[in-house]
């Protein structure tokens, strides 16, 4: 029998707090800079590009949260478990390494520094300044996530509302005094005919679908701390709160993309969205605006960093319990600090190939998890879909590497083979093989199920 505490009915305020936690964990460095840059690249085609971006940047993260809820999973490991413990561990390590200390977490520090602080510093001081800034940044992330039960209050109740207030102020000023007409903005060549697909691929850079799987354990821990102990109650809270969070994120994405397209009335396409954001804020607020931007970026990046290092430590402590949560937390923060000092450009250049590999695998696993009740979570369906997806995804990864790999004899050979696959020129060479794998897996599943039913009838 559940106690009165465990059966406590949550109020709408409780759902909003969990949604705020999810929002804060999802919405980080890339969520500000990539949609803004997309708006500049797409110009007048910003609407079509936005649809593609919202599929991978909003719909897929929502499905990842629903996958956690439907399967009663605690984290990445459980999502991959139908394929066996070995695959689940490898998948968990790859996801956490990518969104964690290798790329995602270091990016939170480098974006906030590059956009928020670097403009105020001479170039010869930026290396040392990044070293000091990233050290302080990850010390703060360590402190906020040190006590697991405080993550909800620290992120959902303190940092996130402050960030939303600052972002709202930026939107009010930008749309009250627009820099240009988005309908007449110039369109870059890639977005003249491929706005939808390019927007779809640009959504990979947010890493939110991967983050949704990784944050599962953090959110589940927080919800259980609110008195929801049984799996059904936890799943219900996660699903409802997840919907609220991604709807808010989607609305902000649209505003950022539109703001990027409007900025072309005053500026050329920038090197990245961080530079564009800095330019826009500087027009409206001058030095004060830049200081506000520095503070805003640091807040949003810190909220994401807290979630990433906590999720890394929680998942790894769960599966490797001989090492404490705090030791994993310290390792994550230290590794992220070291990676951050390679700089933003290096991090982005080397993260793209991993995303081209992991996103297709994550997409199919998320969709399989959501629809798993239809085929009773049969591992054979998972096996064939992943088998047919992993090879072309590896090809996409090799082609996306910097030229030292992609232009090598090996890279060129892989690219030549990959070009024979449908949709390869769009970066979606995995899609048709994945569908073929799904058909094969379902056929095997239903044939196997029918045989078992026949045997039972004979008995």
PLM regions and their residue ranges:
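Hydrophobic, membrane-embedded alpha-helices of multi-pass small-molecule transporters
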Residues: 16-27, 97, 137, 173-180, ...
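Selective recognition of specific alpha-helical transmembrane segments in multi-pass small-molecule
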Residues: 59, 63-64, 162-174, 209-211, ...
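Membrane-water interface regions at transmembrane-helix termini and the short interhelical loops
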Residues: 68-78, 136-159, 225-228, 337-350, ...
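TM-loop-TM module centered on a large, flexible mid-protein loop between adjacent transmembrane helices
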Residues: 75-81, 252-302, 309, 318, ...
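Hydrophobic alpha-helical segments and their helix-loop junctions in multi-pass secondary transporters
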Residues: 101, 105, 164-191, 209-210, ...
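Membrane-interface loop-to-helix entry segments
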Residues: 146-174, 351-363, 382-392
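Hydrophobic, small-residue-rich membrane helices and short re-entrant helix-turn-helix hairpins
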Residues: 147-158, 196-199, 219-248, 266-278, ...
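A generic transmembrane alpha-helix motif of multi-pass inner-membrane proteins
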Residues: 378-459
């Amino acid at each position: 029998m559940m106690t009165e505490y465990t059966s406590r009915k949550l109020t709408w305020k409780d759902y909003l707090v969990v949604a705020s936690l999810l929002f804060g964990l999802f919405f980080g460095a890339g969520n500000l800079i990539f949609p803004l840059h997309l708006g500049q690249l797409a110009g007048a085609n910003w609407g079509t590009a936005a649809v593609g971006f919202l599929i991978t940047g909003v719909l897929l993260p929502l499905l990842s949260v629903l996958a956690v809820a439907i399967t009663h999973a605690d984290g990445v490991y459980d999502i991959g478990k139908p394929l066996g413990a070995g695959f689940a561990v490898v998948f968990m390590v790859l996801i956490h390494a990518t969104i964690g200390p290798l790329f995602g977490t270091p990016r939170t520090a480098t974006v906030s520094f590059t956009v928020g602080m670097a403009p105020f510093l001479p170039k010869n001081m930026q290396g040392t300044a990044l070293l000091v800034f990233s050290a302080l940044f990850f010390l703060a992330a360590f402190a906020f996530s040190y006590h697991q039960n405080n993550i909800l209050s620290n992120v959902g109740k303190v940092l996130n509302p402050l960030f939303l207030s600052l972002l709202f102020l930026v939107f009010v000023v930008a749309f009250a005094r627009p820099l240009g007409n988005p309908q007449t903005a110039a369109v870059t060549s890639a977005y003249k005919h491929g706005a939808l697909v390019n927007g779809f691929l640009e959504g990979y850079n947010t890493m939110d679908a991967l983050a949704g799987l990784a944050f599962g354990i953090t959110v589940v821990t927080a919800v259980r701390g609110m008195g929801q102990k049984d799996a059904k109650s936890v799943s219900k809270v996660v699903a409802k709160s997840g919907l609220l969070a991604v709807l808010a994120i989607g609305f902000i994405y649209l505003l950022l993309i539109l703001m990027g397209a409007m900025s072309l009335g005053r500026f050329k396409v920038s090197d990245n969205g961080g530079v564009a954001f800095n330019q826009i804020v500087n027009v409206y607020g001058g030095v004060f605006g830049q200081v506000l931007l520095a503070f805003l970026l640091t807040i949003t990046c810190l909220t994401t960093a807290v979630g990433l290092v906590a999720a890394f430590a929680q998942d790894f402590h769960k599966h490797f319990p001989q090492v404490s949560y705090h030791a994993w937390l310290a390792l994550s923060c230290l590794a992220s600090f070291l990676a951050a000092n390679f700089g933003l450009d290096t991090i982005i250049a080397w993260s793209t190939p991993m995303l081209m590999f992991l996103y297709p695998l994550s997409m199919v696993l998320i969709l399989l998890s959501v629809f798993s009740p239809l085929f009773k979570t049969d591992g054979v369906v998972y096996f064939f879909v992943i088998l047919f997806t992993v090879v072309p995804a590896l090809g996409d990864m090799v082609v996306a590497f910097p030229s030292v790999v992609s232009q090598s004899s090996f890279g060129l050979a892989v690219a030549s083979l990959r070009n024979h696959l449908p949709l390869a020129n769009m970066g979606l060479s995995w899609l048709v093989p994945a569908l073929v794998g799904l058909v094969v897996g379902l056929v095997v599943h239903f044939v196997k199920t029918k045989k078992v039913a026949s045997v039972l009838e004979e008995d």
